[in-house]
């Protein structure tokens, strides 16, 4: 990454992680990061697709899984090894500024696979259902953004 982009990235991280904080977000953000927190939503989504769309719903689920796998592999196997940005909690120059609410993972951190995967789900669902439900666009983007923000927070 270029020097100016790295500086912007660090400054943005410090602002979100250290300054834009609150007791409510301290409670909410770890929940949003927890994959089990979203299990009921995914169960509802899969049930909804199967009940309302039968065989086509199963195909939608299959493509949803493929979209997530593709997004995850793209972020984890292609982008992260080339960008090689350490997680802020593991970066010796940055970790003194990090406020951790959950444990610190290993490996590289850009892009966030959680954020990439959830934005992939949001775009896929919006593509499927926007013509029927216009509200899905702002809701899905807000959902994916909230998860992305919680990864930084």
Task: Give the positions of each predicted feature.
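N-terminal transmembrane-helix/juxtamembrane module of multi-pass inner/ER membrane proteins
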Residues: 1-42, 75-106
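Membrane-helix interface segments
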Residues: 24, 54-60, 131-136
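Alpha-helical transmembrane segments of integral membrane proteins
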Residues: 29, 59-63, 67, 135-139
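Hydrophobic, aromatic-rich transmembrane alpha-helices
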Residues: 41-52, 118-127
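Interfacial segments of alpha-helical transmembrane regions
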Residues: 46-75
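Transmembrane helix-loop junctions in multipass membrane proteins, especially transporters and channels
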Residues: 54, 84-89, 131, 152
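Juxtamembrane membrane-interface segments at transmembrane alpha-helix termini
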Residues: 71-80, 148-153
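Membrane-embedded catalytic cores of phosphoryl/pyrophosphoryl-handling enzymes
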Residues: 99-153
């Amino acid at each position: 990454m270029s020097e100016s982009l790295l500086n912007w990235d660090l400054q943005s991280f410090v602002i979100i992680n250290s300054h834009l904080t609150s007791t409510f977000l301290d409670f909410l953000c770890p929940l949003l990061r927890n994959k089990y927190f979203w299990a009921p939503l995914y169960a509802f989504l899969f049930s909804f697709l199967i009940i309302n769309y039968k065989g086509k719903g199963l195909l939608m689920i299959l493509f949803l899984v493929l979209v997530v796998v593709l997004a995850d592999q793209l972020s984890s196997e292609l982008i992260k090894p080339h960008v090689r940005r350490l997680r802020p909690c593991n970066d010796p120059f940055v970790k003194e500024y990090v406020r951790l609410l959950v444990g610190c993972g290993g490996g590289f951190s850009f892009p966030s696979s959680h954020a990439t995967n959830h934005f992939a789900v949001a775009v896929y669902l919006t593509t499927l259902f926007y013509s029927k439900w216009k509200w899905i666009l702002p809701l899905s983007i807000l959902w994916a953004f909230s998860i992305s923000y919680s990864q930084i927070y």
